[in-house]
Amino acid sequence: MTDSWERGKGRRTQPPWSAPNTQAQPGLRLYNSLTRSKELFVPQDGNKVTWYCCGPTVYDASHMGHARSYISFDILRRVLRDYFKYDVFYCMNITDIDDKIIKRARQRHLFQQYRERNPRPSDLLQDVSAALTPFLQRISEANDPDKRQMLERIHGSVSAALLPLQDAVSSNARAEELERLSQELMEAAVDLLSDWLDEKHGAQITDNSIFSQLPKHWESEYHRDMEALNVLPPDVLTRVSEYVPEIVAFVQRIVDNGYGYVSNGSVYFSTAKFHASEKHYYAKLVPEAVGDQKALQEGEGDLSISADRLSEKQSPNDFALWKASKPGEPSWESPWGKGRPGWHIECSAMAGSILGESMDIHGGGFDLRFPHHDNELAQSEAYFDNDHWVRYFLHTGHLTIAGCKMSKSLKNFITIKDALQKNTARQLRLAFLMHAWKDTLDYSSNTMESAVQYEKFMNEFFLNVKDLLRAPTDVTGQFVKWEVPELELNSCFYSKKAAVHEALCDNIDTRTVMEEMRSLVSQCNSYIASRKAAKQPPNRLLLRSVSSYLTAMLKVFGAIEGEEVIGFPIGGSDNSMNLESTVMPYLQVLSQFREGVRQIARQHKVTEVLQLSDLLRDDVLPELGVRLEDHEGLPTVVKLVDRETLLKEKEEKRKAEEEKQRKKEEAARKKQQQEAAKLEKMKVSPSQMFQLETDKYSQFDESGFPTHDTEGKELSKGQSKKLRKLYEAQEKLHKEYLQMAQNGTTG
């Protein structure tokens, strides 16, 4: 044996390696509107991802419909960048030249001028009456029931303000009264007066600055809203007004390539010529919508669907690339005369200028698929002469309000600022994370309550882990032997991480991710409770790993800002970690001192000191954002929480106690009423109880027991048997009453 070992010394080599059995890792798949299915995501240029997102048309306040798209895309962008580690280059536009903007700017300008002229009450009445004629015509022609309802509501408000002013003018009321009623009518009639003034004088406006002031204001408000929602700013922001030369050149090349034609100073895209080309296909996203004139005209804009404009087209399916400006519209020089860009060409030219002939991702709301995005695709592929301007088209789902579409006519139009009055930006984001980004999201009290409870559930876990980690220990003391509970929790932890990764690969399924994270926290809570029940400390390192992972995931989703290692920031401050590390040692000393004082107060039964201790816990410290949790036989838990959250909890506790007291008093009142009713019933002698029911019985025996009904018929044996039971029960009650009266206990 020894000889064989000696002989083989020079020839020994390593044995073959046993390679592990590998399973293919899931790759990221995104739902691509171009195929209406989930496709493996493969960027065109290595790790770089080029992304264009349709931005807002800035003519009014941003609303929850905007939030649906921009929060959802912010989440997707962060996941690609911070989880999958792609190098994302994100471009977004601002539409500041548009029919809606032109019309709104003119109306606002003309109404402001009208208000400044301060028309006499009689002139105002005359003008409102004149404006009502076309307004009533609009109501009669309105096909959309929601729009019709809104117009009728405006008409009702105007009528309600019109009559008092008419009466005041007729009765020669005082000037102050006429002024007040005139202002009320002016406010009620702002919409129909603006329309009427625009129809009369809109064509006379020549100052282009009027059309830039409105979008500048609302763009600024939009950026404030996005910052408040913690939506990342784009890497590049393009404004239509800054890209007019590029748009003109873009249109010219489409014409040169044979897909555009000039008509009466405007330029239109020939959908027929484009679709006839072997290398092109019109309406890739929604081919079944081709020929939908309602959708096409909405895409052209309110100022571009007059009979003369529509007659300029070779086909009703064609759309404007460049619009010859009419009087009262802003204009720019072009080879075809003064005009302005069409809506669809704006995005094509700006995206092409920044991202080139092909991009990885284009994003927008679901309702933009046709005609806007289909027309964008056609224009850009006509310009670049390719068939792959966009590789992946992502569309966020609709947003409804408590099950209904959002509409001013339904009085459920909610701006982002309105929403932030009710919930925090984090709570709104959590609500979005708890729904699939491509599906309809219902913004309702139930939806938001679910998000609030999720936040509270996670926050309590983070606070409990922080408290455990603050328990004093030496360097080696933090490393303890793992028993079965730790091994099981760790196995669950890695299983949940794998499930989270799989869900993110599956079209960034944040809904499933949030549920897996909730389940992981539930497992941790059960583990902590079981260790405490066994008088054993939970494993600090394991819980720190779990909470750090959950915090990192919430950071990826944009639900946590700053450099927080574990949990949500305190008060939303980036300096929350410094705050916690600074004040917590002092709070721990205060907590220990308070606990010592309470023990002495209990021993000596000094209730005043115990009351002061409770006052410190319940009223004083919550005002400073500090929560103390007393546990019998265990050290007091100290938690730093947002002051607003603690005050809200305090208010909810107060309301709950008031409700409990109210129910207690209500129960006592009902009991008193029942006892009083019972006492009144006990007072009635059995010989009288049936004689009072003359609507049922007509004859009685000597004891007052009924023998015949109201028709004079003798009662059957069955009826008599039932009544005898009632008689005997009353006899017993009355006897009890007489005994109580004799004893003087009837109250």
UniProtKB/Swiss-Prot annotation:
Binds 1 zinc ion per subunit. Its EC number is 6.1.1.16. Zn(2+) binds at residues 54, 347, 372, 376. Residues 1-25, 651-722 are annotated as: Disordered. A motif ('KIIK' region) lies at residues 100-103. A motif ('KMSKS' region) lies at residues 405-409. It is found in: Cytoplasm. Its cofactor is Zn(2+). It is an enzyme of class 6 (ligase). GO terms for biological process: cysteinyl-tRNA aminoacylation. Its main location: cytoplasm. CDD domains: CysRS_core (cd00672). Residues 651-683 have a biased composition (Basic and acidic residues). Keywords: Aminoacyl-tRNA synthetase, ATP-binding, Cytoplasm, Ligase, Metal-binding, Nucleotide-binding, Protein biosynthesis, Zinc. InterPro entries: Cys-tRNA-ligase, Cys-tRNA/MSH_ligase, Rossmann-like_a/b/a_fold, tRNA-synt_1_cat_dom, tRNAsynth_Ia_anticodon-bd. SUPFAM superfamilies: Anticodon-binding domain of a subclass of class I aminoacyl-tRNA synthetases, Nucleotidylyl transferase. ATP binds at residue 408. GO terms for molecular function: ATP binding; cysteine-tRNA ligase activity; metal ion binding; tRNA binding. One of its GO terms (cellular component) is cytoplasm. L-cysteine binds at residues 55, 95, 372. Residues 15-25 have a biased composition (Polar residues). Homodimer. Belongs to the class-I aminoacyl-tRNA synthetase family. Catalyzes the ATP-dependent ligation of cysteine to tRNA(Cys). This is Cysteine--tRNA ligase, cytoplasmic. The lineage of its organism: Eukaryota, Metazoa, Chordata, Craniata, Vertebrata. The gene is cars1.
